[in-house]
């Protein structure tokens, strides 16, 4: 029996900022991403091949082999995107109880991807969305391309469970999914039991999250064939600097 996937509640491009402010999250389809970023769908899809060369995540505390990823940091100032010196990814335990509290060094994004006009345009677009929420300012951006696969039978997109990221805006692009079941996205209001669940299936569709107002998670994936996978691009934007171990208050 084939399970029915719940479609996401798509928002029109013209309503994006209003919906995001009203409910704390919004989902737009790939056509909207293309229109809002001024990047053709063909140019977006050309980036997909970079997900075929992601190194294994060596930091998984559950012993899994199901996650591959890279990491890079950027600044967005007045719509201009510049790459920041390569740095460790760090989160406090209060936001990531499983992998927080340690400096995780991942291989950088391929320069052949980050040097494209399409990449800069997508990141600049996200900067505009963040400024629409919090006001125009410099944005400190971290980008994480992920591949979750079913090497271990089950792959966990969010092994830390439902969480926030400690930033202002979280963007989750669904790059593709192949030969899997599961991978349902769940978004909950941070101060009430209200929530929604849906499954992103369209390549380059986008979930945007006001991190102060909602928590989110994605359910595990299981194979429908010999090996399945789910590719995403997670981009976080934060005002007032990157999340940094040195900047945390001493208890």
Give the location of each predicted region.
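A short, structural micro-pattern
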Residues: 68, 137, 165, 212, ...
């Amino acid at each position: 029996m084939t399970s029915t996937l719940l479609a996401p509640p798509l928002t029109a491009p013209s309503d994006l900022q209003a919906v995001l402010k009203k409910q704390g999250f919004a989902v737009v389809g790939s056509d909207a991403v293309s229109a809002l970023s001024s990047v053709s769908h063909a140019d977006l899809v050309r980036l997909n091949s970079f997900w075929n060369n992601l190194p294994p995540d060596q930091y998984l505390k559950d012993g899994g082999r199901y996650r591959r990823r890279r990491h890079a940091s950027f600044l967005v100032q007045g719509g201009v995107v510049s790459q920041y010196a390569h740095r460790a990814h760090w989160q406090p335990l209060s936001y990531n109880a499983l992998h927080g509290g340690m400096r995780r060094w991942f291989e950088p994004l391929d320069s052949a991807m980050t040097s494209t006009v399409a990449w800069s345009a997508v990141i600049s677009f996200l900067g505009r969305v963040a400024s629409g929420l919090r006001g125009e300012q410099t944005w400190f951006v971290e980008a994480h391309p992920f591949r979750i696969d079913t090497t271990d039978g089950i792959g966990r997109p969010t092994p830390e469970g439902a969480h926030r990221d400690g930033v202002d805006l979280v963007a989750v692009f669904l790059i593709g999914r192949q030969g899997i079941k599961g991978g349902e996205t769940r978004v909950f209001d941070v101060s009430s039991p209200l929530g929604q669940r849906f499954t992103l299936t369209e390549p380059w569709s986008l979930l945007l999250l006001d991190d102060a107002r909602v928590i989110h998670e994605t359910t595990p994936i299981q194979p429908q064939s010999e090996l399945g996978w789910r590719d995403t691009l997670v981009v976080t934007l934060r005002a007032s600097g990157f999340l940094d171990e040195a900047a945390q208050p001493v208890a």
